[in-house]
A protein has these predicted regions:
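Extreme N-terminal, non-catalytic leader segments
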Residues: 1-14
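C-terminal accessory "lid"/substrate-recognition subdomains
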Residues: 2-3, 159-160, 174-202
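Hydrophobic anchor at the beta1->P-loop junction of P-loop NTPases
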Residues: 18
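P-loop (Walker A) phosphate-binding loop of NTP-binding proteins
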Residues: 21
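Conserved lysine of the Walker
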Residues: 26
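Conserved substrate/cofactor phosphate-moiety recognition/catalytic segment
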Residues: 31-74
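Glycine-rich phosphate-binding loop used to anchor ATP phosphates in small-molecule kinases
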Residues: 63-114, 121, 129
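A glycine- and Lys/Arg-enriched "phosphate-lid" helix/loop adjacent to the NTP-binding pocket
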Residues: 101-167, 171, 180, 187-191
Length: 202
């Protein structure tokens, strides 16, 4: 892995959004991709908030989750080196709100249209893993389909990644290398992962 470059100003840090249903490997991929890019990643605040309350979050609480997720992006951008990897976006929060309550605040709809430089959808192509916080495989499949539909409606061209952790990181690095344009330079693809064996999903 190449040494990290100097941090960019928060306003110009390019963001990578990782989306997908529950148990689709977003957090595992966020960590691995951030490691490969020698940069920072933004954890999912919604999960933390649910673990604190252990209850269905109200529409107002979900709006707070979306606002906090964006605030965390801004805070982590100051520590990023080139790219900022975002483990979910307010689009996911909107999906929970609509599913659980049938409606969502107008502000949440607006936050869900937040744009990212690269949008990635994690395919639900491995066995569903229940960790006590998640729902079930059918809900995961519905989330995946809903996410793809909403991105299409918004005109967002998303990359869907498949397979193991290493395979997904390789797909991401290849995509970034082909589409980076004026974005920060990438490290050698998979430099930190090339000699690792395939990692199972948690």
């Amino acid at each position: 892995m190449l040494p990290p470059s100097e941090p960019l100003p928060r306003a110009v840090v390019p963001r990578i959004a990782l989306l997908g249903g529950e148990s689709s490997g977003k957090t595992t991929l966020a960590r691995a991709l951030a490691d490969a890019l020698a940069t920072a990643w933004v954890p999912e605040y919604g999960r933390q908030r649910w673990e604190e309350l252990r209850a269905t979050l109200s529409a107002d609480e979900l709006l707070r989750v979306a606002r906090t997720q964006v605030d965390w992006e801004q805070a982590h951008a100051a520590r990023s080196h080139g790219w900022l990897v975002c483990d979910t976006t307010p689009l996911t929060t909107l999906q929970y709100c609509l599913h659980d309550h049938g409606h969502a605040p107008a502000e949440l709809h607006g936050l869900a249209r937040r744009r990212y430089d690269v949008t990635v959808v994690c395919a639900p192509d491995f066995e569903f893993v229940q960790d006590g916080c998640r729902r079930d495989a059918a809900f995961r499949a519905a989330q995946h389909a809903w996410t793809l539909e909403r991105l299409h409606e918004q005109g967002v061209q998303a990359l869907t990644v498949h397979g193991s952790v290493q395979s997904r990181v390789a797909q991401m690095l290849d995509h970034l290398a082909r589409h980076q344009g004026a974005a920060p330079a990438l490290p050698e693809p998979l430099a930190a992962h090339a000699n690792q064996s395939e990692q199972p999903w948690p």
